[in-house]
């Protein structure tokens, strides 16, 4: 296909310039580093909530079957965001603005979400989780487009085609961030005193479960807004 031919051409171009030269340009490309940071932090957050979800539903809310509702409140908002994101980006003329303000508003909405979680008001907690997810969801669907923009910027400013290596930040970010997030769930549960064989968990274990699923992702979401705010590409 033409897409495969284009990709092959890009890879050949990268080989022509040499791995060392291309890698040197890459590590000095601030946009590549920022997108890589976004990927790593995003997937740390994602895997924290994925790994801790069943524990939060079972031990904090007292009903393991709630995990299905939690999953839907995270999946459907992203679908809605993906439907509206192109319209918003076209209207504002900036992917960076849409992503930044989406995550900024999402972070603010995390405050009432945490409050209702502490009050164990499930309906309001789920409502704010859903709304929060809609605003944060624009970034999920535009990360690859962001890489494409950064790749184009690199070609314009350096004259070197390095699309293949630019896209490596996605796989690297997923593996590193996902690995850290998954491992952190186990480490922090153990640190909090969680006992897998116990039917009733200690107060410290419950608190850690709450933090893993709700508080830590909230804090990480705020952190993500920092690199997102600097992803407006300038030649």
Where are these regions (language model features)?
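Helix-loop junctions at membrane interfaces in 12-TM secondary transporters
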Residues: 115-128
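C-terminal ends and interior cores of transmembrane alpha-helices
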Residues: 106-118
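A membrane-interface helix-boundary motif in multi-pass transporters
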Residues: 190-218
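Juxtamembrane intracellular "pre-TM" segments in multi-pass secondary transporters
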Residues: 7-34
């Amino acid at each position: 296909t033409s897409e495969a031919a284009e990709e092959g051409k890009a890879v050949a171009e990268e080989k022509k310039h040499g791995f060392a030269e291309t890698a040197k340009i890459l590590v000095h490309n601030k946009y590549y580093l920022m997108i890589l940071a976004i990927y790593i932090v995003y997937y740390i957050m994602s895997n924290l909530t994925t790994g801790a979800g069943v524990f939060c539903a079972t031990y904090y809310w007292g009903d393991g079957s709630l995990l299905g509702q939690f999953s839907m409140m995270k999946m459907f908002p992203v679908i809605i965001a993906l439907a509206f994101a192109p319209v918003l980006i076209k209207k504002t003329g900036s992917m960076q603005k849409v992503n930044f303000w989406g995550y900024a508003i999402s972070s603010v909405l995390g405050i009432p979400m945490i409050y209702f979680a502490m009050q164990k008001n499930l309906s309001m907690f789920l409502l704010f989780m859903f709304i929060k997810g809609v605003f944060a969801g624009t970034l999920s669907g535009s990360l690859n487009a962001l890489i494409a923009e950064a790749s184009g910027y690199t070609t314009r400013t350096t004259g070197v085609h390095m699309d293949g290596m630019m896209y490596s930040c996605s796989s690297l970010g997923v593996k590193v961030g996902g690995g850290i997030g998954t491992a952190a769930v186990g480490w922090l549960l153990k640190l909090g005193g969680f006992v897998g064989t116990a039917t009733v968990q200690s107060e410290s274990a419950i608190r850690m479960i709450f933090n893993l699923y709700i508080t830590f992702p909230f804090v990480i979401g705020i952190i993500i807004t920092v690199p997102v705010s600097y992803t407006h590409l300038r030649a």
